[in-house]
Amino acid sequence: MACHSIEEEDNTIMGNFDALWNILDRHYCFFDRKGVDWDEVYRRYRPQAKACRTAQQLFDVCARMLDELRDGHVNLSASFNTSYYRKWWSDYPQNYDERLVLKHYLNFDYRQAGALTYAMLPQRIGYVSYRSFSSTIGEGNLDAVLSYFEIAQGLIIDVRDNGGGNMTNVETLVRRFITGRTLAGYTVHKTGPGHGDFAEPYAYYYDAADAGRVRWLKPVVVLCNRSTFSAANNFVSVMRLLPTVTIV
């Protein structure tokens, strides 16, 4: 049985700073894509870390360092705080108001099927709002919603301000809009500590919903905004590939 040693930094302010920097240096995937010189970031933030006297001061320095990645999926957690990168939405005007939609478009007259809010709009247009891919979508929920829209001419799927969640729910929803095996995207794995150490991309596919399930093959408009994030973005990217779908 083979084994290898794992380098551990000292449990000190500088040891913890270096450990965090090294973990990202070896495992983070998007330095080149984001144009981040991680070595330059180290040189800039290490003196700030060296001046720290408490864990909370170090946390703040490390959080600012991670913000250089401009990545909403990179967080730093401690017993007293969790850091998030927010500027991907906080630096821009908010362009979605759920109450405005419920009041002026749905007139507070809507149905709820699990995590899906839905209603028939004028001119026989179906409207479905899905607020979070963390909320499970049941197959029965989808059958009920799509059956309700049987006479609709088109369908609006609103994923504005949807912060993402479970990729399984993305697949469950997309399967209702395809007729057969459909390319959904590509996955690439990091294979080593170098910034360019990646395996070849491999494709993954979604299959159409099982026989007997209600499908929708008429026109679809997907509404998204800057706060459509993570798994919700993946949903939009897959739906964009379908010929009956328009992204707004």
Give residue spans per PLM region:
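Short, conserved helix/loop micro-motifs enriched in His/Cys and acidic residues
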Residues: 210-223
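Short, well-ordered coil/turn elements that cap or connect secondary structure elements
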Residues: 122, 215-217, 242
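Short, well-structured beta-strand/strand-turn elements
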Residues: 155, 229, 242-248
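Flexible, low-complexity junctional segments that flank or bridge functional domains
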Residues: 2-206, 219
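Active-site neighborhood of thiol-dependent amide/isopeptide-bond enzymes
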Residues: 224-231
